[in-house]
Design a protein with these regions (language model features):
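Acidic, Ser/Thr/Pro
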Residues: 2-305
Length: 305
């Protein structure tokens, strides 16, 4: 590189325009839900159809049919959870954290949607309510319900902790959780870290802050299609004692608490249809990425091969 390229003040006087979000929703865009409709769905009478408490440092999966409401709460106080979502009938369609981050924000809240991978690209679930929505941006730049990071896993733990072996990181908890549905480790994917506060420091480095949730805080989702969801109660608990090393798991268990999951159906089975709601559909792109597929060996386009 030239001296000019390495000059410390090279970009000192560069004028940078005020940035505009890359994906601003237009009228009728699927990025901008009808808040009146979704608010009415959240407030409509509902019937409990499934309920369980997820113990500390464990994982569990459950089904949520299209139109059902999933409520996740902190029954005993602050606790971080790592959430995965799949199309119930096709696990190759799963939550796409990075695209969701682009379409919405680095941290999610009410009316944001969890989008699926290509070639499907549709909302799997939409956040109906968030009791921590008022948290906003704290003095360190942290926000809640994180999409910047991903799940903790035994591989990075072994690398950073001199070969330490621990089997109950969120990745492992999710792997065990989905096995009864025929899914494997490769099906576990980047997560939505619910109730987790994160951000980037002045050097652009990822940080985590203690969970702000209190007893009874909640996050609710509307299933936009039939989904399989899986949740891990993070072994870091509320992250107030987060760390790596031989003693880290023994320390962090002191701040671990359960999470509670409830699945509801609306009492009025026609309510969603009357509101104009329909299950989400895959992206309408039907092209071939510029390719032409031959009809057979006698096709003129392939005769020279």
């Amino acid at each position: 590189m030239s001296d000019e390229q390495t000059r410390p003040d090279r970009f000192k006087d560069r004028k940078v325009p005020v940035p505009v979000p890359a994906y601003l929703p237009s009228a009728g865009s699927p990025l901008a839900v009808d808040k009146d409709v979704y608010s009415s769905i959240q407030q409509a009478p509902r019937v409990l159809v499934n309920e369980f408490t997820l113990p500390i440092r464990s994982g569990r999966a459950w089904e949520a049919p299209a139109g059902s409401i999933v409520r996740i709460t902190t029954p005993e106080g602050p606790q971080v959870g790592d959430l995965n979502v799949w199309n119930l009938h096709n696990p190759s369609e799963r939550f796409w954290a990075s695209r969701t981050r682009q379409l919405h924000a680095s941290h999610l809240s009410t009316y944001d949607r969890l989008w699926s991978t290509l070639p499907y690209l549709r909302p799997l679930v939409t956040i109906l309510s968030d009791s921590l929505s008022s948290y906003g941006k704290d003095i360190n730049g942290g926000r809640v319900h994180d999409l910047l990071g991903t799940r903790c896993d035994p591989y990075v733990n072994s690398v950073l902790s001199s070969g330490a072996q621990y089997d109950f990181h969120c990745h492992s908890n999710l792997v065990r959780a989905v096995m009864p549905w025929g899914l494997q480790e490769r099906d576990v994917h980047d997560v939505l870290n619910i109730f987790q506060v994160t951000g980037l420091d002045k050097e652009g480095r990822y940080f985590m802050s203690p969970c702000p949730a209190e007893k009874g805080d909640s996050l609710e989702f509307l299933a936009e299609t039939d989904v399989l969801m899986a949740l891990s109660t993070c072994p870091g608990g509320d992250l107030s004692l987060w760390g790596f090393g031989a003693d880290s798991e023994a320390e962090m268990i002191k701040v671990c608490r359960p999470l509670h999951v409830q699945v509801y159906q609306l009492e009025d089975k026609d309510f969603l249809a009357n509101q104009g709601w329909k299950p989400s559909e895959p992206a309408p792109y039907r092209g071939m990425h510029g390719m032409k597929v031959p009809e057979g060996e006698n096709n003129p386009r392939t005769a020279s091969r």
